[in-house]
């Protein structure tokens, strides 16, 4: 269900020739048909969310095609022209290097980088926002950037839920409860949902849910009897918060609205929104 202000609406893409129109329409249809409530103050916020999700998907595919390597933190490596590898295996932005340039280098020279899956997901989020922000804004928000698992910049606002419906552009988690301790890095897999039943996970590539589970199951202890599974954890960029940094001239997606109800009372507790 999608709510704009106090109006429950069924939105649709009005310009079928705009970039990624089919993908955006699919996202809108999924959100409108879900039981979860997606609340936006304005149509522009919904437009930003759509464009953000599309950029998360394209950034995930770009990272997959970049040659970016899967490595544990003990074996991680980065381009020393832009980053310094920390003692824990993270990547610390070098002084006087613009975060925007350093993030773009990961996608241009992926073979010069290697790390595990959580860091890769955060890199995708940064790249998606960079596609929507002016570089000076991105560099101001994410100065002194550190890439290390979930130790992301405080200005990157994320929402993690343990319930809800998966929408393309969401980050999900596959858990492998009986992982072989010899390959503990496969205790789980963070993955971006690309839509059409496919996910991107750093280390497993672009696969269906069943294929990712199969890959994780191959790395269990001998005689394991508990399968890996897709958890109910969903992580998203807080598009309402992050949309405030988009420039005024940000291209807007052409969205039409079929009104369903315009007197909804919207109540939000934490990250859960309810309609009365």
UniProtKB/Swiss-Prot annotation:
The keyword Acyltransferase applies. Keywords: Acyltransferase, Sporulation, Transferase. InterPro entries: Gln_gamma-glutamylTfrase_bac. It catalyses: L-glutaminyl-[protein] + L-lysyl-[protein] = [protein]-L-lysyl-N(6)-5-L-glutamyl-[protein] + NH4(+). It is an enzyme of class 2 (transferase). Signal peptide: none annotated. HAMAP family: Tgl. This is Protein-glutamine gamma-glutamyltransferase. It comes from Bacillus mycoides (strain KBAB4).
């Amino acid at each position: 269900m999608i709510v704009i202000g106090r109006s429950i609406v069924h939105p649709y893409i009005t310009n079928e020739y705009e970039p990624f129109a089919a993908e955006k329409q699919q996202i809108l249809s999924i959100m409108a048909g879900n039981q979860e409530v997606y609340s936006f103050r304005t149509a522009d916020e919904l437009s930003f969310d759509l464009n953000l999700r599309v950029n998360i998907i394209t950034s995930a595919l770009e990272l997959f095609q970049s040659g970016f390597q899967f490595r544990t933190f003990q074996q991680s490596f980065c381009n020393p022209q832009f980053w310094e590898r920390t003692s824990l295996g993270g990547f610390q932005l070098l002084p006087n290097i613009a975060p925007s340039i350093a993030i773009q280098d990961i996608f241009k020279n992926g073979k010069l980088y290697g790390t595990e899956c959580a860091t890769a997901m955060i890199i995708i989020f940064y790249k998606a926002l960079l596609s929507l922000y002016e570089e000076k804004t991105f560099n101001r928000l994410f100065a002194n950037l550190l890439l290390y698992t979930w130790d992301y910049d405080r200005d990157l606002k994320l929402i993690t839920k343990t319930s809800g419906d998966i929408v393309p552009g969401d980050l999900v988690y596959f858990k492998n409860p009986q992982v072989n301790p010899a390959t503990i890095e496969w205790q789980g897999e963070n993955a971006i949902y690309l839509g059409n039943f496919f996910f991107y996970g750093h280390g497993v590539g672009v696969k269906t849910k069943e294929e990712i589970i199969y890959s994780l199951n191959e790395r269990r202890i001998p005689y394991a009897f508990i399968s890996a599974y897709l958890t109910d954890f969903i992580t998203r960029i807080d598009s309402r918060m992050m949309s405030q940094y988009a420039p005024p001239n940000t291209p807007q997606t052409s969205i039409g609205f079929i009104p369903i109800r315009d007197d909804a009372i919207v109540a939000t507790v934490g990250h859960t929104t309810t309609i009365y």
